[in-house]
Amino acid sequence: MRLIPLKNTTEVGKWAARYIVNRINAFKPTADRPFVLGLPTGGTPMEAYKHLVALYKAGEVSFKNVVTFNMDEYVGLPQEHPESYYTFMHSNFFDHVDIPAENINLLNGNAPDIDEECRRYEEKIKSYGKIHLFMGGVGVDGHIAFNEPASSLASRTRIKTLTEETREANSRFFGGDANLVPKYALTVGVGTLLDAEEVMILVTGRGKAQALQAAVEGSINHMWTISCLQLHAKAIMVCDEPSTMELKVKTVKYFSELEAENIKNL
């Protein structure tokens, strides 16, 4: 596992965006051989999307031959709802870059057959071979995507019941009323994430410190689903200073020295 210790949210977003652009450009994608990118929603990746759009507008990257798969979507929320992840992705990213509509893959939380929708999503991912890079965030309780505590580490795309903690955390997008946050969501599984060639998790804020500590220094534990990344061959945690507050000083020092060349000139 790599840990990229940065100062603030802006640096986290800038580093993540540059990393994605470098990976896409090094891959040299074509229509027949697209780069497959996994994407999250929420507050944490907002800076990354802002910088990705800026890099696209600067002519440093094209998304024409990039295929995307999003992590999750609420069940029962209309697609056009301002807080649907469909709306979020189009407002913050897709509508500002040159990605073709047919290359965008989002879970349908209003599908008539939810189980079939989840199977279809998994099959679509497999049809591309694998996801080359999956960017994600982490919840205060260590969940990745909507794989809440006690999720199977072998799980695939499925419907999940959201915890009260998650609904409370997401209530800030629903006028502060947790009762307006849907109770269920479709999400890629932990196993789906682990199948990706590379996983990059963005961690920002003091509230995520315990989750980061569990991921980096704790044992592999389904109560902290983020800890599954210890099993991944190419996992990267990109974090700001407040989120490292629960890590041992020597842990932060170790990774700061190890990644010194990769975090300068931000």
Curated annotation (Swiss-Prot):
Q: What class of enzyme is it?
A: hydrolase
Claim: Cell membrane is one of the keywords in the record: no
Explain what switches its activity on or off, per the activity regulation comment. Answer: Allosterically activated by N-acetylglucosamine 6-phosphate (GlcNAc6P).
Spell out the disulfide connections. none
Q: Where is this site: Part of the allosteric site?
A: S151, R158, K160, T161, Y254
Q: Which residues form the active site?
A: D72, D141, H143, E148
Q: Which family does it belong to?
A: Belongs to the glucosamine/galactosamine-6-phosphate isomerase family. NagB subfamily.
| Protein name (Swiss-Prot/TrEMBL) | Glucosamine-6-phosphate deaminase
UniProt source species = Yersinia enterocolitica serotype O:8 / biotype 1B (strain NCTC 13174 / 8081)
